[in-house]
Amino acid sequence: MSLIIFTSAQRLRSVCRLQRIHGHMMSSKAGSEVLFEKVGKAGVITLNRPKALNALTLNMIRHIYPQLKKWDKDSETDIVIIKGAGEKAFCAGGDIRAIAEAGKAGNLLSQVFFREEYILNNTIGTYQKPYVALINGITMGGGVGLSVHGQFRVATEKTLFAMPETGIGLFPDVGGGYFLPRLQGKLGLFLALTGFRLKGRDVQRVGVATHFVQSEKIESLEKDLVDLKSPSISDVAQLLDSYQEQSHLDAEKPFVLQEQTEAIDRLFSAGSVEEIVENLKKDGSAFALKQAETLAKMSPTSLKLTFRQIEEGARMSLQEVFMMEYRLSQACMNGHDFYEGVRAVLIDKDQSPKWKPSTLAGVSEQFVDKCFSSLDERDLKL
């Protein structure tokens, strides 16, 4: 969507058009990958890579972060709304193909991307003004980081949530170590290890989203959010509550994991990934065996790092989690499985990654310890 406006000097006198030009000037700085607009006293961010499912790039991060900082201090900005362009995605994740290419070439992007992404995620998690993420469509990885730490996350029937990183030799980062262990029971660990996908109302039911609103009402909701006068967190919550009450779609449909919740809590209550796999195989139910089959496809290294990440993150502050995850990100950049996972899933698309080590037993506790160890002066500082 182009915001370039050609107009005569006479037409420039229109206040409305001047505001639109101001919106264009703000957006063009980001090379159109992300658009910024002031609508009244609302700051609106649009992730604008619809053909790439709004995948997050370093360029986008480097424009969103200072804009959020500016709006946070601006007395003329009362609320921030973030959304994705197009019908398919809010944000399908980070631009991991670019990160993999940079890492292979020894480019600093593989360090800088994660560092700046986590700093942005932390800014969202500590934002003082109402922050509303309209997560309509695919919301995975980096897209979760742009939404889940904010005060309000609005899912629709089109929302598709997952943290699929163990399947590409990574781990559920962007603060996954904070929000996942705080979901009910062992659900967060289950989602982290298996990459299980949640859709629509279920995203709100588990707490990843704060509200569920039918997609046909999102445009109206955004207008009403913009029209709020100096809104408090409570004012925004009341408006979102009212829209949720009017959204009856799938209300009678049971939670997709309703019948498996007890089994998840029981089978994933274990001291190691190996023990979880053993529990699943011993259980023998169709659900348990399917999860065992899923785990067998994932990077053994990623599974072990993720298990420890969720375990440690349950006792950490959000800032401590980001520091831990930055260490893990760099361990993955220095390893084998991330590059192999990206090759198998995104480049060659043969879906047959050759993990090294290829078994859980091959990933030693000493190696895992090393991945969590300090990077000294290269540690993330928040």
Curated annotation (Swiss-Prot):
Swiss-Prot/TrEMBL keywords: Branched-chain amino acid catabolism, Hydrolase, Mitochondrion, Transit peptide
GO molecular function: 3-hydroxyisobutyryl-CoA hydrolase activity
Reactions performed catalytically: 3-hydroxy-2-methylpropanoyl-CoA + H2O = 3-hydroxy-2-methylpropanoate + CoA + H(+)
Pfam families: ECH_2
GO cellular component terms listed in the entry, alphabetical order: mitochondrion
Catalytic activity, EC: 3.1.2.4
Pathway: Amino-acid degradation; L-valine degradation
Ligand binding (substrate): E117, G142, E165, D173
UniProt subcellular location: Mitochondrion
InterPro entries: ClpP/crotonase-like_dom_sf, ECH_dom, HIBYL-CoA-H
CDD domains named among the record's database cross-references: crotonase-like (cd06558)
Enzyme class: hydrolase
Family in the record: Belongs to the enoyl-CoA hydratase/isomerase family.
PANTHER family named among the record's database cross-references: 3-HYDROXYISOBUTYRYL-COA HYDROLASE, MITOCHONDRIAL, 3-HYDROXYISOBUTYRYL-COA HYDROLASE-RELATED
NCBIfam families documented for this protein: PRK05617.1
Function description: Hydrolyzes 3-hydroxyisobutyryl-CoA (HIBYL-CoA), a saline catabolite. Has high activity toward isobutyryl-CoA. Could be an isobutyryl-CoA dehydrogenase that functions in valine catabolism. Also hydrolyzes 3-hydroxypropanoyl-CoA.
Name used for this protein in its record: 3-hydroxyisobutyryl-CoA hydrolase, mitochondrial
Native source species: Danio rerio
